[in-house]
Amino acid sequence: MGRHIMFFNIPALGHLFPTLGVVSELVRRGHRVSYAATADRAGYVAEAGARVIPYTSTRPGDTDPAARTPARAEHIGRSLLNFLAEAEHTLPQLEPALLADPPDLVLFDRMAFAGHVYAHTHGIPAVQLWPMIVSAGPWSLGEAVPVDLTHPTLAEYTLRLERFLAGRGLSTLPADEFLAPRVARHLAFLPRAFQYSGAAFGDDFGFVGPCTTPRAGDPDWSPPRDGAPVALVSLGTLNNHWPDFYRLVFEAFADTPWHVVLAVGRRLDPASLGSPPPNVEVMPVVPQLSVLAHARVFVSHGGLGGVMEGVQAGVPHVAVARTLEQDLNAARIVDTAIGASLNLDGLTPGRLRDAVTRVDTDPRIAAGVAAMRAEVLAAGGAARAADLVESCLREPAGARALAPQG
């Protein structure tokens, strides 16, 4: 008999997309899945087979030209504040529907603090989702990069979190343990081989790799009829208002054999970039999985979801990182020989073009991509993720209590 499983997430597509294959697989197995989603994400969730629990978000929409990720110096503190504000705003909207129809298990994204708090408050077993490099247990982001623990955003976050938890009757949960919950299971949408210190993580961390599935509403796309090699260039859906970079792409690939598919997002008018070269195809949004099936190289900001989808398709990467998290992904891309990383400082059309040529022709990178792709395929994807979720439903309730990691 199927059980009721609830997903909490944030609206960012890089966090939403990795979960949809898991949703579809759980529904296929007879479970009833509910998923908190904003109006602009509801179609994806419904297509995967889940019941949508609607809410409004504090996070910027896809067309907001002012949307930016935090600067590196305040990345951690500002991000924590942003997602705490999201939890404060969203949990009161979602809780009535869940009180009327309680779930048997909660799955919550690392940054979906509302799911963490809801599960803890109501004593419901939970699974934490990682659409990013895992920062827990054997490896910590805070230890891997310099973090100014005196930055005012961190102090503000701690005070605000303490007030939020106290208001939910969780004043005994220390703020410094809030980000380290002991849950029934962790699901990470990457293979163990890509994770920093991957071998040191225990079996409670399921590195299942990407769980891709066709996406509702993807635009149509066809590969070039002349058989030209395809390079996909995309900066994702958040920090993508970067007209100077797109013009640099025009210059880098004009009069080259490459057919470039360039996603520029919904935050600018493509016409404002000027006329692209004939071999550069400009689109607000691209059907990424379809393009990757034909691509030879993927140039991106280094978001983990895109990196994993590229590896799954056997496509090497060129990362142009813009945030602290992306810096770490880019370094891992180089470490595992699945691509290259370019520094924003001094980026030129020639350097971009040369990097694309190198990752396309370097036998070492071809071998690295093949090896990591084998790891991705062995990780199990959505089927293994669903197996692990179901194992949480079978465990005794006491073994699944939400508590801080030791």
Task: Please place each PLM-identified region on the residue numbering.
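Glycosyltransferase specificity loop/lid
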Residues: M1-A155, L159-E162, L262-G406
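Short amphipathic alpha-helical surface micro-motifs
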Residues: S34-Y35, D109, A166-T172, H186-R192, ...
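A short, active-site helix/loop in glycosyltransferases that binds the activated sugar's phosphate group
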Residues: E156-D204
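Structural motif
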Residues: L98, F178-L179, P223, S290
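A structural signal for alpha-helix termini and helix-coil/disorder junctions
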Residues: A100, G167-S171, F189, A193, ...
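Hydrophobic beta-strand segments of well-ordered beta-sheets in folded domains
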Residues: I5, A184-H186, H259-V260
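Donor-nucleotide binding loops and adjacent catalytic segments primarily
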Residues: Q195-V297
